Amino acid sequence: MSVNKGENIGLDIEKTKTFKNFLLKENHIFYISFFIIFTILSVIGLNKSQFEKITKVLLNSIITNFGFLYLIIVLLIALVCLYLCCSSYGDIRLGKDDSKPEYSNISWFSMLFSAGMGVGLVFFGVAEPMTHFVNPIGGIESGSKSAIDFAFNTSFFHWGIHPWAIYSFLALGMAYFQFRKGEKGLISSLFSPILKGKKYEKQLKMIIDVIAILATITGVATTLGFGALQINSGLNYLFNIPNNIVSQIIIIGVVTVIFVYSALGSLDKGIKTLSNLNVLISFLLLFIVIVLGPTIGIFNVFSESLGNYLNNFLKISLRTNSFGDKTWLSSWTIFYWSNWVAWTPFVGTFIARISKGRTIREFIIGVVVIPSLVSFIWFSAFGTLGISLGREFAKVAIEHTETALFLVFGEYPLGDLMSGVAIVLLASFFITSADSATYVLGMMSSDGDLNPPKYKKLIWGVFQSLLAIALISAGGLDMLKTASIIIAFPLLILLPIMIFSLFYSLKRDSFIKKRIKLKNEIKKMSLEEIGYLSDTVKDLRICKEE
């Protein structure tokens, strides 16, 4: 008996070692994530109604108990980005001190903007301002001047500084640890200062990376679902193609073939080219809207709404509607913040990948300030285009969010042309977002490899499209929103820890240490010595210029 016991103990130890090795092997991040997504797809396929019930319970629990956390954490991140941009940390370069950017400013902006917003701008550009115009909260009269102010103020809030700050913070952290500290290009790298040397460091990092992969797939699948719904609506409006699940599956299928083919190529050939094309088409459509729409009105709205937004920045950032209906908050602000958080692993990883060599200040201006201004102009133009048609028209248009854009275009000259351009733009954004996500998913499931295996990119490309189809068939627009909120919650809880970890490293950065040492040396110097030093620096600059 004792021998058998010893053998059993030996077997148990071996099993434990095997399980630990399984967790520590880099490739098993891919297998574990694959298994979880496959299970979710199977559950949706076998029992849609039960899946819908479970997700509703989870959604209500998150909104009721933790809704305020979304607002506080996202505002905190926006303030952190502002501080980093304005402080001495802003001079730190994402890479070695002599690193140079790999991409031109135009290509860099095109890629980060296409990855960060994409389909959402086209989907909600008209629909959101019109919805808030018709259904404002806080006792504001529907269709009034106050409702117009509320509509644009809220749209700016949902698509401006806050979402881009979320992207910027995570991308900044990843780029800093990857290119300056030599860490892997993974979300878990942001936790290195905290977890380094701890007993379960590798296991905890693996769990974080699996959560990041799940959030990315769900977040992108949600956006692909929105894109398919609106492309289908546009084709139905222009060509009377049936607006149903079959058409949406075909659209997703065709787009999947294109973006997977693109993702299997190089970053420069695929995503960069598509991103530049996106920006060109976007500005073309924006230009047409401004010229054919109420041009002066659009610029007046932009100016006034920007002032209102900045004036009420803190107030709207923490608006919870404490004693009112929480439905509005969950359907709009919390949905958006969840969607942005769910997208951060993908967008953050991608932006980090293309931002090597830029300073922190340059990075934040490029990733937060400029895209926010473009979003403000976009919503001013498209929102004014819709609201100018009046409250009664808006009520009809927003009955189906995905068709609102095409109904509004139909009321203006060259409406069919604008609708056609919008469909092309939707498809292009659709492809670019999925293309970028496929690359990042391959990278995250390959231990941060900047050139992940093609078979992984192929599998993730197909899986995110299958999940989009499953969510649409399970509950359409509502299910897409619900899935995004639920999957983003674990990541939301991790964000404050990431803030602490980043500042912990920044304070110990060699660049900051050198600057502090120099300041201390200057403090010890006399005024004459400082004057002499200043003259010497000027002479050196003149010599360098000559």
Sequence positions of predicted segments:
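Helix-loop-helix module between adjacent transmembrane segments
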Residues: 12-15, 21-31, 35-45, 78-81, ...
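Long, low-complexity, intrinsically disordered cytosolic termini of multi-pass membrane proteins
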Residues: 1-5, 517-546
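Membrane-water interface regions at transmembrane-helix termini and the short interhelical loops
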Residues: 17-22, 47-62, 81-100, 151-158, ...
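N-terminal alpha-helical transmembrane segments of multi-pass membrane transport
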Residues: 2-147, 264, 287, 500-508, ...
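Membrane-interface alpha-helices at helix entry/exit sites of multi-pass transporters
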Residues: 68, 105, 143-151, 199-210, ...
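Membrane-embedded translocation segments of transport machinery
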Residues: 200, 212-358, 365, 370-392, ...
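Transmembrane alpha-helical segments of multi-pass small-molecule transport proteins
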Residues: 31-46, 71-79, 239-265, 284, ...
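Flexible loop linkers connecting adjacent transmembrane helices
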Residues: 10-20, 53-59, 86-105, 130-153, ...
